[in-house]
């Protein structure tokens, strides 16, 4: 199963993780997650006041889903969830949640890292520090 979307709403990472686990079966031996948060100092503005996450395309949800599908196929995962914040957010706010499940930890760690690297290329969501 693949769940992927962008949202202006605050990420409820615990609810998303709980829902993910409720969809799991005994085919998964490992669940790995990445919970990305906005940190200081910033990359462009060390002491930024806000961060803007701006969509660069109209189909952000489909782009996230494509990354999730690629990870699922490439790493033979059982389930993938990718959720990305949009809009104006603060330091310490959650920006990205990626959760994967599969048979073994090595494929799950590799897949989760690959998803984060793909999203961080900023090809369809731009991060602007103010």
Annotate each predicted stretch with a short phrase.
Residues 1-94, 101-130:
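N-terminal, polar/charged subdomain of small-to-medium soluble alpha/beta proteins
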């Amino acid at each position: 199963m693949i769940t992927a979307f962008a949202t202006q709403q605050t990420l409820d990472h615990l609810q998303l993780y709980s829902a993910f686990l409720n969809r799991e079966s005994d085919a998964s031996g490992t669940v790995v997650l990445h919970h990305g948060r906005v940190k200081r100092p910033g990359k462009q503005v060390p002491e930024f006041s806000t961060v803007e996450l701006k969509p660069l395309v109209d189909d952000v949800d489909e782009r996230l889903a494509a990354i999730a599908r690629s990870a699922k196929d490439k790493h033979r995962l059982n389930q993938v969830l990718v959720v990305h914040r949009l809009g104006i957010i603060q330091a310490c706010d959650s920006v990205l949640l990626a959760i994967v499940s599969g048979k073994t930890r090595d494929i799950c760690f590799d897949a989760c890292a690959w998803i984060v690297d793909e999203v961080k290329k900023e090809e369809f969501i731009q991060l602007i520090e103010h």
